[in-house]
Design a protein with these regions (language model features):
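Peptidyl-prolyl cis-trans isomerase
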Residues: 34, 68-174
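Short, low-structural-confidence N-terminal segments
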Residues: 1-88, 92
Length: 174
């Protein structure tokens, strides 16, 4: 009887411990400096890197077979003949994209940059257009509207940063 009661208590405890468990993507996957990398932003950068690799694929390579394509070798520079394994190329390009976004955001903030309501609206409209056009693909890859908005806002920051640094009233006018 005691063993049955103990087994029941253990089963209930186990059941309750699993009740709150769900498998989900974490909100953030890391940071570069003060720049928090959301899971969506990481996935968007990775998706973009994979698409770049697909553009570099030879005619005999099938980028739609992801598992096989990641093991393939692509030519990354036709002039030098430099090659890379797709999985390595995607990892490197993903990292490079995230580092660039972090650097843009940090520099924009360091120079006191703030996006105007018009700039935010433009970025958000473009993000919605991107979701209207590619939403099924983005959603299937774990990328939502808020991620695309954040990415497009960073692109607007990038454009504004160029003017803040090199514009007529910039830090280093050209």
């Amino acid at each position: 009887m005691k063993k049955k009661l103990l087994a029941l208590v253990c089963a209930l405890a186990l059941t309750f411990s699993f009740a709150g468990c769900t498998i989900s993507t974490p909100d953030t996957v890391g940071s570069i400096g003060d720049f928090e990398i959301t899971s969506g932003m990481y996935l968007l950068a990775q998706y973009g890197a994979y698409q770049q690799a697909a553009q570099l694929a030879g005619s005999d390579q099938d980028a739609s077979d992801v598992k096989a394509f990641l093991k393939e070798t692509i030519t990354t520079d036709s002039d030098s003949g430099e090659t890379a394994v797709v999985s390595d190329y995607v990892a490197q390009q993903t990292q490079q994209t995230l580092e660039t976004l972090a650097a843009v955001d940090a520099r924009f903030k360091a120079l006191g940059g703030e996006l105007t309501a018009e700039q935010l609206s433009t970025a958000d409209r473009y993000a919605q257009q991107m979701m209207d056009q590619y939403g099924d693909t983005y959603t299937a890859n774990g990328i939502g509207l808020e991620t695309v908005k954040a990415y497009e806002r960073l692109q607007v920051e990038h454009t504004a940063l160029l003017d803040m640094v090199y514009g007529p009233d910039g830090e280093t006018p050209v």
